[in-house]
Curated annotation (Swiss-Prot):
Biological role: Catalyzes the ATP-dependent conversion of 7-carboxy-7-deazaguanine (CDG) to 7-cyano-7-deazaguanine (preQ(0)).
Protein name (database record): 7-cyano-7-deazaguanine synthase
Organismal lineage: Bacteria, Pseudomonadati, Pseudomonadota, Gammaproteobacteria, Lysobacterales
EC number(s) from the headed UniProt entry: 6.3.4.20
Protein family: Belongs to the QueC family.
Species, as recorded: Stenotrophomonas maltophilia (strain R551-3)
One biological process term in Gene Ontology: queuosine biosynthetic process
Disulphide bond pairs: none
Gene name linked to the record: queC
InterPro entries to which the protein is assigned, alphabetical: QueC, Rossmann-like_a/b/a_fold
A GO MF label: ATP binding
Binding site for Zn(2+): 186, 196, 199, 202
Chemical reaction(s) catalysed: 7-carboxy-7-deazaguanine + NH4(+) + ATP = 7-cyano-7-deazaguanine + ADP + phosphate + H2O + H(+)
Broad EC category: ligase
CDD domains in the record: QueC-like
Regions annotated as coiled coil: none
Length: 221
């Protein structure tokens, strides 16, 4: 069976991506990153999702981005209750670049030719590293910067949620049997994973279930 590395945050998007990769016949190796995020309950959620969805392996890598700072998700900066103009304070500098680079490295070690991520450019918070241009640029990097890219078949970067709305993501996940009740999306989630219901991540998540006509399984504080 062909192997793939899938980035798994513990949120609803990455849970859906795992199911999509499995439907395509991939043996999924899930990769989570402990980057110093304040909402560590998402990593507990990642472990639950990995177990429930039967991945081949689940690895958590430590890269402490608190030493760099610059984000409300790592620093002592308040998370806003509503999205505003421009790039929000919840943007973590270079996070997706770092995470995809780790996935790329693990894929090379595993001999995998595919990596998956859950970036989304439709219903998202304005992050520059969720845009289609970013995914295309990282694909070019993967082609140039890896042994596999230079000597072999290369490593393909998949972003299957890129042009889906949150409602479409929920519908697709439900079709594939994803238990979204296991996931955590909230930027302010407590130690038990209970969501605040006010932040932008909570707003987008609730919007997705409403659009899909699916009961929201989220645990709220």
């Amino acid at each position: 069976m062909k192997k793939a590395v899938v980035l798994l945050s513990g949120g609803m998007d990455s849970a859906a991506v795992i199911a999509m990769a499995q439907e395509q016949g991939f043996a999924v190796h899930a990769l989570s990153v402990r980057y110093g995020q304040r909402h560590t309950s998402e990593l507990d959620a990642a472990a639950r999702v990995a177990k429930a969805q039967g991945v081949i392996a689940h690895k958590t890598v430590d890269v402490d981005l608190r030493s760099i700072g610059g984000s409300a998700l790592t620093d002592d900066i308040d998370v806003p209750e509503a999205g505003g103009a421009g790039i929000p304070v919840t943007y973590v500098p270079a996070r997706n670049t770092i995470m995809l680079s780790l996935a790329l490295g693990w894929a090379e070690v595993l001999g995998a030719n595919d990596i998956f991520c859950g970036v989304n450019a439709v219903d998202y918070s304005g992050y520059p590293d969720c845009r289609p241009e970013f995914v295309a640029a990282f694909q070019a990097l993967a082609n140039l910067a890896t042994k596999s890219g230079v000597e072999g078949a290369g490593i393909k970067v998949h972003a299957p949620l890129q042009f889906l709305s949150k409602g479409q993501i929920v519908s697709e996940g439900v079709r594939l049997g994803v238990d979204f009740g296991l996931t955590v999306s909230c930027y302010n989630a407590d130690a038990n994973g209970a969501a605040c219901s006010h932040c932008d991540a909570c707003r987008l998540r609730a919007q997705g279930f409403t659009e899909a006509g699916v009961a929201d399984p989220t645990l709220y504080a």
